[in-house]
């Protein structure tokens, strides 16, 4: 494959970093004759694919985008009044251009390294403050995957926090139907008894209650007495709520709710055919240590200045594994940032004004429809009306279709309409005319909207201000907003500045051509429950991408519904569980998991109702075959599955993978192959053809969806034919599950985060079969080049046959702790002074660094990283020799801020120049960490998860 592009539109050499000449140099340096020879040395021959993938050849950016435009044009943009948790919204253009379309925001990683993540941590703290303020609760997390999964997480949080011994969780029938189905799926896996009913008739004995506030079909109830009754029996009260409605109605925390969940979608994030959108959760302080998802907290840095960080991480799956509060890993950070900035942009008066306008227009519509003789079933409302349309229902729906308008069909005799901030008076008059036409009546004029809150009972009207923190009143103009966004972005390190060599994270190029289609109206403005006749373009995209991914993986079926890798794991394990049950083997509920597995693996197994048994690793980091066989014998007929990551989390292709799969199959189990490391296999090995039964993929890793600072992601689950009937169920246009479905949905929308599926589709089309294979080969080359160049300075902990690694390598820095007192964390923080994000720390082996360069980093950037790591080793050598102090040195004090280096006095055992400019190239291009090393322990001891007063930064 020639490096030099034949035309300016040749994409492959723009995605792959090293030129052909650079690749030759690197191959010579590691002693490999060619890329093909290197792959032969790395990938076991028993699994190596020789035939090219049956995919079209690479195409130009122009061709691919034109084809996608054709596809998008097949979607029909209707005026939507469906509601049901998804609403029209205006994305502020300043946020669209400077956040959603800005690689400084969308290419960042999860802020586990807080010193280089202060900008997005501040934006997330705004979001948490907004959610806690509007819900009236003590603490909010930094986003969940969507509203339905947030409700399921509320159920599990209620079970952990309840004083009741009852196995029952009560769910109001007034919840959105898709929420009911996602909660039902979760309850079945955990053995929770779900009771769905009308809460006005009283509560059964239960450990928790889930309410909808306002109701799915429009009512606004006073739940104060119900909450008291639930608390009296030891139950936890959760409610699904609407952030915009909470500008006008009483916060759930004030009437007794313990947990509030929902979606922040209508705060500036378009439909996207169902996602991605940020789910939210807020709760009382008593539940904070059991709360799922990431949590931004305020701490201080080494200089005593306020600094932000991810708090209470010991709750999370990467630490607690099967004992974690949730399997949540990737969430929806980019969308949470947008929602929080929507509140900053509009401010408290603006948000309340939008809410008042929506409520006022709903009242005007109610009056107009009453004038047509339509019976409105709900006497209270915020934005939704339930209409008893009887035998006229089909005619009204036909009239709506003629007017390119979508209504929510509740059943054969009832419709519902929901309004939002995008609705104009002209839209509303057109809607009234639709009903007049359907009823065969003369058109009536829409009455003038009245500025009143008549639809909201006086007892539940919000009293007092909203969004009272000064940050929400800080922006007076677009100039202010632009500068605020630039200030935040400048605090962070993302791929637009530097390589992010995080092992197991695949921080590769997110090309502009891949990103462009996600904001096209034909993709962005489609409601997830729009009729199928309006979404043929989306269905062509979904079917095409599904077929491509099946070809790449060698599987027979796939679901794109899971909206994170962890959800894909969960869906795959549910499929295995349902398969065993269908075969009359419900006792198969044990999942074998290697000790080195990703933390999501055991957490997902637990959510799927499985018991986890750990399998040991051998001295080379591989699955210990003898221990595997012993564990299989130990669990016997209870064996459900083995979860294995491949290539392994130790960065090698295990030679015995087919033997491992055979052993599990012979014992009646299924093999789940975690696809987190698929970037090392595309085009060279197909897991569905070498023994695995099911895998999830991380489209936000291998297939170029950006990480967004911690989401969005898409985690499709791919299966062999025998598991295909057990893929997640797809909801219909009313949000209801097909009664023939064998497994329920795992996401609220039928196709999950469909709005970002154009990204992997474009990537695959631009690369073609040959380009995808070459990307894998170069990813492996880059990792082996780094390993070879650094091996004399840091031991490479694991290697496969021929001394090769896969697409990542583990640098063993543990001996340095003994000789110098320097830890992996010290090296990670010192890399910030060199302008780098740290590699993955202490996973899968404590005290090590795991490096994954991906194929997108060129030789010059690899050399810059290598230079930094060698220079840091020399700094450690100065400590080892006694030339530098063991406690006061450039590593222990890293990172160094400009404030530290400009201090009037300097008392350290090394010069300022070494701290700031350890290599000459930094004088030309220097990133300054905005805070010094963050005190993690202080932040957890003094937990604050909302914006600090302005005075704290003085």
Swiss-Prot record:
It catalyses: N(6)-[(R)-lipoyl]-L-lysyl-[glycine-cleavage complex H protein] + glycine + H(+) = N(6)-[(R)-S(8)-aminomethyldihydrolipoyl]-L-lysyl-[glycine-cleavage complex H protein] + CO2. Keywords: Oxidoreductase, Pyridoxal phosphate. The modification N6-(pyridoxal phosphate)lysine is found at residue 701. It comes from the Bacteria. InterPro entries: GcvP, GDC-P_C, GDC-P_N, GDC_P, PyrdxlP-dep_Trfase, PyrdxlP-dep_Trfase_major, PyrdxlP-dep_Trfase_small. Its EC number is 1.4.4.2. GO terms for cellular component: cytosol; glycine cleavage complex. Its cofactor is pyridoxal 5'-phosphate. Gene3D superfamilies: Aspartate Aminotransferase, domain 1, Type I PLP-dependent aspartate aminotransferase-like (Major domain). It holds the Pfam family GDC-P. GO terms for biological process: glycine decarboxylation via glycine cleavage system. One of its GO terms (molecular function) is glycine binding. The glycine cleavage system catalyzes the degradation of glycine. The P protein binds the alpha-amino group of glycine through its pyridoxal phosphate cofactor; CO(2) is released and the remaining methylamine moiety is then transferred to the lipoamide cofactor of the H protein. Belongs to the GcvP family. The glycine cleavage system is composed of four proteins: P, T, L and H. This is Glycine dehydrogenase (decarboxylating). It comes from Bordetella parapertussis (strain 12822 / ATCC BAA-587 / NCTC 13253). The gene is gcvP.
């Amino acid at each position: 494959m020639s490096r030099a592009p034949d035309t300016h539109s040749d994409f492959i050499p723009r995605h792959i970093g090293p030129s052909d000449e650079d690749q030759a140099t690197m191959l010579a340096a590691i002693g490999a004759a060619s890329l093909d020879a290197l792959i032969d040395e790395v990938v076991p021959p028993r699994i190596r694919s020789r035939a090219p993938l049956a995919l079209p050849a690479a195409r130009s950016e122009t061709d691919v985008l034109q084809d996608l435009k054709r596809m998008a044009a097949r979607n029909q943009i209707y005026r939507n009044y469906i509601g049901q948790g998804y609403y029209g919204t205006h994305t502020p253009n300043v946020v669209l251009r400077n956040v959603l379309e800005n690689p400084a925001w969308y290419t960042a990683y999860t802020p586990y390294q807080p010193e280089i993540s202060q900008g997005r941590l501040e934006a997330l703290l705004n979001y948490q403050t907004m959610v806690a303020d509007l819900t009236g609760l003590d603490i909010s997390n930094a986003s969940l995957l969507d509203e339905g999964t947030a409700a399921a997480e509320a159920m599990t949080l209620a079970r952990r926090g309840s004083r009741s011994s009852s196995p029952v969780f009560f769910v109001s029938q007034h919840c959105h139907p898709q929420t009911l189905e996602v909660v039902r799926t979760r309850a079945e896996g955990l053995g929770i008894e779900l009771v769905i009913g009308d809460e006005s008739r009283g509560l059964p004995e239960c450990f928790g209650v889930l309410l909808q506030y306002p109701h799915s079909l429009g009512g606004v109830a006073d739940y104060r007495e119900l909450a008291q009754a639930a608390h009296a029996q030891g139950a936890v009260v959760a409610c699904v709520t609407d952030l915009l409605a909470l500008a006008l109605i009483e916060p759930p925390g004030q009437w007794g709710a313990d947990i509030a969940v929902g979606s922040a979608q209508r705060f500036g994030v378009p439909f996207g055919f169902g996602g991605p959108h940020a789910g939210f959760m807020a709760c009382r302080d008593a539940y904070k240590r059991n709360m799922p998802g990431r949590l931004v907290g305020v701490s201080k840095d080494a200089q005593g200045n306020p600094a932000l960080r991810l708090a209470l991480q010991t709750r999370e799956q990467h630490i607690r594994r099967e004992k974690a509060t949730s399997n949540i890993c990737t969430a929806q950070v980019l969308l949470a940032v947008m929602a929080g900035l929507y509140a900053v942009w509009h401010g408290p008066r603006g948000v309340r004004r939008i809410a008042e306008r929506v409520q006022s227009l709903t009242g005007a519509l109610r009056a107009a429809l009453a004038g047509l003789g339509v019976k409105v079933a709900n006497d209270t409302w915020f934005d939704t009306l339930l209409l008893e349309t009887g035998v006229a229902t089909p005619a009204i729906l036909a009239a709506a279709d003629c007017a390119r308008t979508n209504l929510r069909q509740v059943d054969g005799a009832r419709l519902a309409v929901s309004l939002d901030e995008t609705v104009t008076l002209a839209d509303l008059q057109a809607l009234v005319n639709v009903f007049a036409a359907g009823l065969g009546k003369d058109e009536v004029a829409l009455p003038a909207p009245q500025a009143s809150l008549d639809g909201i009972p006086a007892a539940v009207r919000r009293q007092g201000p909203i969004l009272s923190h000064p940050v929400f009143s800080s922006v007076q103009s677009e100039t202010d907003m632009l500068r605020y966004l630039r200030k935040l972005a400048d605090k962070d390190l993302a791929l637009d500045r530097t390589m992010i060599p995080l092992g197991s994270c695949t921080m590769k190029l997110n090309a502009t051509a891949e990103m462009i289609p996600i904001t096209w109206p034909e993709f962005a403005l489609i409601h997830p429950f729009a009729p199928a006749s309006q979404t043929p373009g989306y269905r062509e995209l979904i079917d095409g991408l599904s077929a491509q991914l099946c070809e790449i993986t060698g599987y027979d079926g796939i679901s794109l519904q899971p909206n994170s890798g962890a959800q894909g794991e969960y869906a795959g394990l549910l499929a295995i569980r349902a398969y065993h049950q269908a075969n009359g083997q419900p006792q198969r509920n044990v999942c074998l998991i290697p000790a080195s597995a990703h933390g999501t693996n055991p957490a997902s197994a637990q959510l799927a109702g499985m018991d986890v048994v750990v399998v040991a690793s051998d001295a080379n980091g591989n699955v210990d075959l003898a221990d595997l066989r012993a564990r299989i014998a130990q669990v016997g007929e209870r064996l459900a599955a083995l979860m294995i990551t491949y290539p392994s989390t130790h960065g090698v292709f295990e030679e015995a993978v087919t033997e491992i799969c055979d052993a599990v199959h012979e014992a009646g189990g299924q093999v789940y192959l975690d696809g987190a490391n698929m970037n090392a296999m595309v085009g060279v090995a197909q897991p569905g053809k070498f023994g695995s039964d099911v895998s999830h993929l991380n489209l936000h890793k291998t297939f170029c969806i950006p990480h967004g600072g911690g989401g969005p992601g898409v985690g499709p689950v791919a299966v062999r034919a025998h598991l295909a009937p057990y893929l997640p169920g797809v909801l219909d246009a009313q949000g209801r599950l097909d009664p023939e479905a064998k497994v329920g949905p795992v996401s609220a929308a039928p196709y999950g985060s469909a709005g970002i599926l154009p990204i992997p589709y474009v990537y695959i089309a631009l690369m073609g079969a040959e380009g995808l294979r070459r990307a894998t080969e170069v990813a492996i080359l880059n990792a082996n080049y780094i390993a070879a160049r650094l091996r004399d300075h840091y031991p490479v902990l694991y290697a496969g046959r021929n001394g090769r690694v896969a697409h990542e390598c583990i640098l063993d820095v543990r001996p340095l702790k003994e000789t110098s007192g320097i830890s992996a964390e010290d090296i990670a923080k010192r890399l910030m002074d060199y302008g780098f994000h740290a590699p993955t720390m202490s996973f899968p082996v404590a005290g090590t660094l795991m490096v994954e360069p991906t194929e997108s980093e060129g030789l010059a950037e690899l050399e810059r990283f290598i230079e930094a790591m060698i220079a840091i080793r020399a700094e450690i050598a100065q400590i080892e020799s006694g030339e530098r102090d063991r406690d006061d040195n450039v590593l222990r004090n890293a990172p160094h801020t400009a404030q530290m280096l400009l201090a009037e006095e300097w008392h350290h055992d090394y010069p300022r120049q070494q701290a700031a400019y350890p290599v000459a190239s930094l004088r030309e291009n220097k990133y300054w960490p905005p805070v010094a090393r963050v005190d993690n322990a202080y932040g957890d001891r003094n937990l604050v998860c909302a914006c600090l007063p302005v005075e704290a930064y003085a």
